[in-house]
């Protein structure tokens, strides 16, 4: 299998969206930690907690703890610090938490010699423009994402999670140092599930996206390694 980390293509984060440890480890044991990153979201963290994060870290994996903190600044400060203590590689907060919350999260990492990347979630890939209007925000989804991207950049965060279609413009506006993580990656034959804003791996490379998050396309595959190889080859 080609290693995307040594080529000019997006690096791959596998979303461990399972309801039990046995199923998760069945996939983890097939993966090379020098090639793939792992994402732990709310489901697995709620079931298995900090211990599971530490176990995966000890296996040599870089862990993206995707808990999307969104609370008052003091709570987010303490939660961010606690998460960083786990030795994770990347951590997410919600950009819509506002300037004070984002700055508080960034401050929480100052005492760490090797702090995790702090990433702000702009809009979920399941999010539709109509949902903005329902909560009284009368701008386009693209404009909303760009505003939150600028806010996160101004607050000193390392990057954002955003749908692929906006990534190209964000890279142009904020440069290559500002990391872009994009879920909703599908190859042609994949099901969409509940995601609306999707792109192909090839487009992700074209848009200079830094990391692509792949979940159900892999976790529900009968042959996940073959599927991953297909995804990597599609980016060549």
UniProtKB/Swiss-Prot annotation:
Cellular component terms per the entry's GO annotation = cytosol
EC assignment: the record states 4.1.1.23
Keyword Transferase recorded = no
Named in its record, the pathway it takes part in is:
Pyrimidine metabolism; UMP biosynthesis via de novo pathway; UMP from orotate: step 2/2
Which GO terms fall under biological process for this protein?
Answer: 'de novo' pyrimidine nucleobase biosynthetic process; 'de novo' UMP biosynthetic process
The record's keywords, sorted A to Z, are: Decarboxylase, Lyase, Pyrimidine biosynthesis
What catalytic reaction does the record list? orotidine 5'-phosphate + H(+) = UMP + CO2
Quaternary structure, from the entry? Homodimer.
Protein's job: Catalyzes the decarboxylation of orotidine 5'-monophosphate (OMP) to uridine 5'-monophosphate (UMP).
Q: Which family does it belong to?
A: Belongs to the OMP decarboxylase family. Type 1 subfamily.
Output this protein's name. Answer: Orotidine 5'-phosphate decarboxylase
Q: Which organism is it from?
A: Buchnera aphidicola subsp. Acyrthosiphon pisum (strain 5A)
Q: Which gene encodes it?
A: pyrF
């Amino acid at each position: 299998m080609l290693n995307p980390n040594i080529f000019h293509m997006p690096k791959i984060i596998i979303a461990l969206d399972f309801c039990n440890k046995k199923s998760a480890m069945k996939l983890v044991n097939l993966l090379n930690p020098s090639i793939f990153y792992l994402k732990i979201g709310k489901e697995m963290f709620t079931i298995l907690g900090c211990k599971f994060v530490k176990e995966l870290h000890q296996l040599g994996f870089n862990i993206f703890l995707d808990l999307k903190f969104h609370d008052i600044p003091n709570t987010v400060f303490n939660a961010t610090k606690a998460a960083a203590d786990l030795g994770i590689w990347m951590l997410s907060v919600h950009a819509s938490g506002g300037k004070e919350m984002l700055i508080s999260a960034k401050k929480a990492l100052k005492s760490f010699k090797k702090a995790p990347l702090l990433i702000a979630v702009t809009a979920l890939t399941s999010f539709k423009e109509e949902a903005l209007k329902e909560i009284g925000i009368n701008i386009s989804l693209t404009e909303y994402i760009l505003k939150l991207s600028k806010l996160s950049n101004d607050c000193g965060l390392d990057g954002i999670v955003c749908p692929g279609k906006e990534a190209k413009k964000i890279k142009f506006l904020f440069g290559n140092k500002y990391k872009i993580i994009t879920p909703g990656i599908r190859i042609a034959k994949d099901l969409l599930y509940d995601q609306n804003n999707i792109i192909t791996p090839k487009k992700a490379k074209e848009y200079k996206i830094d990391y692509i998050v792949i979940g159900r396309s892999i976790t529900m595959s009968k042959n996940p390694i073959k599927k991953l190889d297909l995804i990597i080859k599609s980016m060549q």
